[in-house]
């Protein structure tokens, strides 16, 4: 109760303002609400404007239903609050941020395009415009994955080692590519694309199937590996003809998946030694000798595999010279402490970027695929993002941008959740708590922002991270996964004190000018 009273008095002097359009909430019986959007209405946010010097902006989302609501307060010359003090240390700098985003899978594209054009536009605007959460990363699967409705690659003609029959199907030309172009037009920020393959054509594989235990035939340096490396270049060539260029490719989506008998959907197995030699002899040279200025990210699998996978690949100078970064997935994070994996990998290879390339909830066998309005799932996202940022990761990529209420479509029924769920019969979509949790980072932390130290005066259950934006302003994100309200003060040594309170089950983003 005392904490609630403190929070009440702290914000008596704060003026409230709301985004351009408030949320229309709807409960589906879970812990919080979704925001309902249709052809005629969708909640939106104002473009980010820096508050006047000496004041701060606070964006708040709560389990009780606030969604990135803006308030403005004054930075005080003297501290008046008690309890937790978070001190910004801007001189202690860490990694620079690449960005935040999600994946344009076949399933995502099918769901978006099943909506009416006005509703499609509002969905894309929610993700990519200044009135939305301003994603700047899009992941693109190279050909089919489990979130497709059919199985295909770009070169299914057997023994076509010249890739003469390589071609993009309508999933790319009619679905994904047009939507990516729409996103690019809506965005005020440069959007970086990265691509990942799930499987090679079956005629290049030891098991002759898209799924199950199987890897490339032969040995690195041979015609099978060279053809597969050239397939990457063909993909980049094909997308370039549609005016799309890629920031990066990953060497393989979850390369360990293809090492398991009975793996249910598209995969291609690599050990770390196999990936090392494929990169050094085939993929690295193929990309370097192409016309594309594209980065190569290794691993693209669970961080549980670190640091060993990085040690195997990057200890070989011939492979290391082609590797820009290490991509990680989140699914086994509960078995892999960040310090022992991400932290140790950064210690060993401080000049190789770490990048979170896939995450979703609802994939584990004990989880319900979709839980409309789950606040806990939003907190799982923001907890992961903060943890990753604190351990040198430069960006965080969600999985499907939009799914249906079942969590698909997915050809092997591997249904999962998504920040946006599309209700096709109603020509509507639902923005979940996950969407807003992601927005607390993506909208306010543009590419080039740099993490700095933020030191707590005492042990706390709050999870926090601080960054300096390219414009010199400061951003602090505070996540409270507990039920208790927590009074706190943020100290900027050059300016003064931000007196505030973190309500139970909330996430806040603070933004202020430093000069």
UniProtKB/Swiss-Prot annotation:
Its EC number is 3.2.1.45, 2.4.1.-, 3.2.1.-, 3.2.1.46. Glycans are attached at residues 38, 78, 165, 289, 480. Residues 1-19 form the signal peptide. InterPro entries: GH30_C (IPR033452), Glyco_hydro_30 (IPR001139), Glyco_hydro_30_TIM-barrel (IPR033453), Glycoside_hydrolase_SF (IPR017853). The active site is at residues 254, 358. Keywords: Cholesterol metabolism, Disulfide bond, Glycoprotein, Glycosidase, Glycosyltransferase, Hydrolase, Lipid metabolism, Lysosome, Membrane, Signal, Sphingolipid metabolism, Steroid metabolism, Sterol metabolism, Transferase. The keyword Chaperone does not apply. It is a peripheral membrane protein. This is Lysosomal acid glucosylceramidase. The gene is Gba1.
């Amino acid at each position: 109760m005392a904490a609630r009273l403190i929070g009440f008095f702290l914000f008596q002097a704060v003026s409230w303002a709301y985004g351009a359009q408030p949320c229309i909430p709807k409960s589906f019986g879970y812990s919080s609400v979704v925001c309902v959007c249709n052809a005629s209405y969708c909640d939106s946010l104002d473009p980010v404007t820096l508050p006047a010097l000496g004041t701060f902006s606070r964006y708040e989302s709560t389990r009780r239903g606030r969604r990135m609501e803006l308030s403005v307060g004054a930075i005080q010359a003297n501290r008046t609050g008690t309890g937790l003090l978070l001190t910004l240390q801007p001189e202690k700098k860490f990694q620079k941020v690449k960005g935040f985003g999600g994946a344009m899978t076949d399933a995502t594209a099918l769901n978006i395009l099943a909506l009416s054009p006005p509703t499609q536009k509002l969905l894309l605007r929610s993700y990519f415009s200044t009135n939305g959460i301003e994603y700047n990363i899009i992941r693109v699967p190279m050909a089919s994955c489990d979130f497709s409705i059919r199985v295909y690659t770009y070169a299914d003609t057997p023994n076509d080692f010249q890739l003469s029959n390589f071609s993009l199907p309508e999933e790319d030309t009619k679905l994904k590519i047009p939507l990516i172009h729409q996103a690019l037009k809506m965005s005020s920020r440069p959007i970086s694309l990265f691509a990942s393959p799930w499987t090679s054509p079956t005629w290049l594989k030891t098991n002759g199937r898209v799924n199950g235990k199987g890897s490339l035939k032969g040995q690195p340096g041979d015609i099978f590996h060279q053809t597969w490396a050239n397939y990457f270049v063909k993909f980049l060539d094909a997308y370039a003809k549609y005016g799309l260029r890629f920031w990066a490719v990953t060497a393989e989506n979850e390369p360990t998946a293809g090492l398991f008998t009975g793996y249910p959907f598209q995969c291609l197995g690599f050990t770390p030694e196999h990936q090392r030699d494929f990169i050094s002899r085939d993929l690295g040279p193929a990309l370097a000798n192409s016309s594309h200025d594209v980065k190569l990210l290794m691993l693209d699998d669970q961080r549980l595999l670190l640091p060993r996978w990085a040690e195997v690949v990057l200890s070989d100078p011939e492979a290391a010279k082609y590797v820009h970064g290490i991509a990680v997935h989140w699914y086994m994070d509960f078995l892999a402490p960040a310090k022992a994996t991400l932290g140790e990998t950064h210690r060993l290879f401080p000049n190789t970027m770490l990048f979170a390339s896939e995450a979703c909830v609802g994939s584990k066998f004990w989880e319900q695929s979709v839980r409309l309005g789950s606040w806990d799932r939003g907190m799982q996202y923001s907890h992961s993002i903060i943890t990753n940022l604190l351990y040198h990761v430069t960006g965080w990529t969600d999985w499907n941008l939009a799914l249906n209420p079942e969590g698909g479509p997915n050809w092997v029924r591997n249904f999962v959740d998504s920040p946006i769920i599309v209700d096709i019969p109603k020509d509507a979509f639902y923005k979940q708590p996950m969407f807003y949790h992601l927005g607390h980072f993506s909208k306010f932390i543009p590419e080039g922002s740099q993490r700095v130290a933020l030191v707590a005066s005492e042990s706390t259950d709050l999870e926090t991270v601080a960054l300096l934006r390219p414009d010199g302003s400061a951003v602090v994100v505070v996540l409270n996964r507990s039920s208790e309200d927590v009074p706190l003060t943020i100290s900027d040594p050059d300016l003064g004190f931000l007196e505030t309170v973190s309500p139970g089950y909330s996430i806040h983003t603070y933004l202020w000018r430093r000069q």
